[in-house]
């Protein structure tokens, strides 16, 4: 399938002047012949393979490949179409280039029917702007129409390399950013030609090109979003939970994103295209909730100057139907059940340039967000995102189920630890508040490093007087909780159920009782002083709560019912209380494998088998006193009293010859496969046939004198 780099006359039906000229001066008139034969619309089927392509060479694909028929495409004569060569220089050349070193190959060279060069034209991808034709597409993975088989190098490599570089420049300029609403299926429509005046309607793009195309459009969308959205609110990502409870995704923007709305923000859009209205509604609800709480600032609240100049990380609030449960560092709060008030969004990304302008609103939204929060539902989990911290300065809080609180505090060297954590630990007495603080310095970072963020999550649970535990679950009963306690009876039943449990579980119950007492006393006094849980006590009770989280949920009725069911299902040991003569009769009816199992299971059964000399029902030991001392034919073991062992070794005395090679040895013939010795591995000392007359005579003589006990 190699194309020759020299001119070769393929058909004799050509005009004589063309064939003579190509035979005499092939290299001088090569470019002219290429322009006349390939650029014109009248193309004969015996086009010569060109060794090099000019910059203006552009060839149209064949619709019908026929060797002797002139294909009229535009209705012009060959002379007229050859004069229009210079007007078509902007059209892209339909060439195939194999790698960086090889030159372009003329894939429109069609010769004899059945030739391999004709197949090349069949397999060439149709990337011209006028026609799509009836050609095959060999693969949609070919990049830039590149063929997959090896071709010979063309003669003029310099021109080929220049043309390849031009094609790559054209491809890099072709992808114009478009709105993100256009899906992946429209990627092939937006491929613009070299001159920029046309599109390739059906061009198959590779995966790499589609990915680059989508990245270009995503960056264009981000630039447009930074112009439209003044504050760049957090975009919501649905991560597999219920439809009404999305999670807050990451949103990053430049430090001056609030003062300069036209600046591009590195905003990653993660919501599915099927639910855009739900995302917009939730963003509007978040904004309205933040605006609602702006007027509730207290005098001793958190200052913006030292902690609000940070970037927003990622908070995952999952698996909840009561979505009004927590807030992020910038006042972003989930509120699907609140009223929709689509006002301007409260600032999510606050840079140093807008610190003075946004501080009162942000402080009010931050301080007022803990007023009407319902208790923490099940499955809320906060964790650390990718963080750049000093060594030993991380905080991770994980609430794995609704009954235990796991907190790890390693605030050692954070520059904002003394002020931030004290504010994050203070919670009002009537709610369970979940805070998430994402603090990353923006001043020392360029836009490439802005994706590194810290997510510090702190969860502190408070207990009311009427509900003396942190087990405040939903109103509807959860499936599978039949034997579990209601939340009000948890502490009283847990203390009496786990009397024999570990020391950690008792400490956990004492911790909960102490927390309940503190909250009750605070509510009776009516003071608004928040309850501050010390970090050392929370850190010390981490293994305690985790170890006892599953034991303390079960009621006493369930334990009693389970014990009764276990007693009914437990096998009763009646056999050990039977008299010996009944047990001996039962054992003599058992095969060898069953007796082996009984002997190895219980010492009492082993004593009975050996003392009463119990033989298995399928035993092959000879009972005749003349042969009872004979060993096993297979393993040469002699019989002892109470031996119920299996024979573990089989000789293979029989040779099975094969016609095509060495045979194999067998322990028995095929007709004796049902014999117990082959299947079970029983001991056998039958050396002499029992029905022999000599054996009968000897047996009669020894019958009167035999006084030994039969084995």
UniProtKB/Swiss-Prot annotation:
It comes from the Eukaryota. Residues 10-23, 354-364 have a biased composition (Basic and acidic residues). It holds the Pfam family F-box-like. Residues 572-624 form the F-box domain. Substrate-recognition component of the SCF (SKP1-CUL1-F-box protein)-type E3 ubiquitin ligase complex. Directly interacts with SKP1 and CUL1. This is F-box only protein 34. It comes from Homo sapiens (Human).
């Amino acid at each position: 399938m190699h194309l020759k780099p020299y001119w070769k006359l393929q058909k004799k039906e050509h005009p004589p002047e063309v064939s003579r000229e190509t035979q005499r001066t092939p290299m001088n008139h090569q470019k002219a012949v290429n322009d006349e034969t390939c650029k014109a619309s009248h193309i004969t089927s015996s086009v010569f393979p060109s060794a090099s392509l000019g910059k203006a060479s552009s060839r149209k694909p064949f619709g019908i490949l026929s060797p002797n028929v002139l294909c009229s495409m535009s209705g012009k004569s060959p002379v007229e179409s050859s004069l229009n060569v210079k007007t078509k220089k902007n059209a892209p050349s339909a060439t195939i280039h194999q790698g960086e070193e090889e030159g372009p190959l003329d894939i429109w060279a069609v010769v004899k029917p059945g030739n391999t060069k004709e197949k090349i034209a069949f397999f060439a991808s149709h990337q011209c702007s006028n026609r799509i034709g009836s050609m095959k597409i060999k693969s949609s993975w070919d990049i830039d129409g590149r063929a997959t088989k090896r071709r010979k190098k063309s003669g003029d490599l310099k021109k080929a390399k220049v043309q390849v570089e031009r094609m790559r420049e054209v491809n890099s300029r072709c992808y114009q950013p478009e709105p993100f609403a256009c899906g992946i299926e429209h990627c092939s429509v937006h491929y613009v030609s070299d001159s920029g005046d046309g599109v390739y309607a059906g061009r198959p793009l590779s995966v790499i090109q589609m990915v680059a195309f989508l990245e270009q459009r995503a960056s264009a969308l981000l630039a447009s979003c930074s112009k439209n959205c003044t504050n760049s609110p957090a975009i919501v990502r649905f991560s597999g939970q219920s439809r009404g409870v999305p999670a807050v995704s990451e949103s990053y923007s430049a430090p001056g994103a609030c003062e300069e709305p036209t600046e591009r923000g590195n905003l990653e859009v993660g919501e599915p295209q099927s639910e855009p209205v739900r995302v917009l509604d939730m963003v509007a609800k978040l904004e309205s909730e933040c605006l609602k709480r702006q007027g509730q600032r207290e005098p001793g609240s958190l200052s913006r100057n030292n902690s609000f100049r940070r970037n927003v990380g990622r908070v995952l609030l999952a698996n909840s139907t009561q979505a009004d449960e927590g807030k992020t560092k910038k006042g972003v709060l989930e509120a699907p059940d609140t009223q929709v008030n689509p006002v301007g969004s409260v600032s999510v990304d606050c840079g140093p340039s807008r610190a003075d302008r946004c501080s009162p609103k942000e402080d009010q939204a931050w301080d007022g967000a803990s007023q009407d929060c319902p208790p923490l539902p099940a499955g809320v989990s906060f964790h650390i995102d990718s963080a750049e911290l000093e060594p030993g300065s991380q905080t991770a809080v994980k609430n794995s189920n609704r009954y235990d609180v796991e907190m790890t505090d390693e605030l050692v060297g954070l520059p904002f630890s003394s002020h931030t954590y004290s504010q994050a630990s203070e919670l009002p007495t009537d709610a369970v508040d979940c805070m998430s603080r994402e603090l990353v310095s923006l001043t020392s970072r360029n836009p490439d490093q802005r994706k590194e963020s810290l997510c510090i999550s702190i969860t502190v649970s408070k207990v009311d007087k009427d509900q003396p535990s942190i087990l405040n679950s939903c109103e509807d009963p959860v499936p599978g909780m039949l034997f579990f306690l209601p939340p009000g009876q948890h502490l009283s039943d847990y203390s009496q159920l786990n009397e024999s449990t570990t020391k950690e579980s008792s400490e956990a119950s004492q911790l909960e009782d102490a927390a309940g007492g503190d909250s009750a006393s605070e509510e009776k006094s009516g003071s608004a002083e928040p309850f501050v849980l010390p970090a050392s006590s929370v850190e010390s009770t981490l293994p305690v709560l985790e170890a006892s989280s599953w034991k303390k949920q079960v009621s006493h009725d369930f334990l009693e019912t389970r014990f009764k069911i276990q007693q009914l299902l437990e096998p009763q040991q009646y056999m050990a209380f039977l008299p010996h003569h009944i047990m001996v009769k039962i054992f003599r009816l058992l095969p060898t494998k069953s007796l082996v199992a009984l002997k190895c299971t219980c010492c009492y059964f082993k004593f009975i088998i050996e003392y009463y000399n119990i033989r298995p029902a399928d035993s092959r030991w000879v009972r005749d006193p003349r042969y009872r001392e004979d060993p096993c034919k297979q393993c040469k073991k002699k019989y002892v009293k109470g031996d119920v062992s299996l024979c573990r070794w089989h000789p293979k005395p029989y040779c099975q010859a094969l016609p095509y090679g060495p045979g194999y040895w067998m322990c028995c013939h095929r007709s004796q496969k049902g014999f117990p010795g082959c299947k079970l591995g029983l001991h056998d000392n039958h050396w002499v046939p029992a029905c022999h007359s000599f054996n009968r005579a000897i047996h009669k003589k020894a019958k009167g004198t035999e006084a030994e006990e039969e084995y």
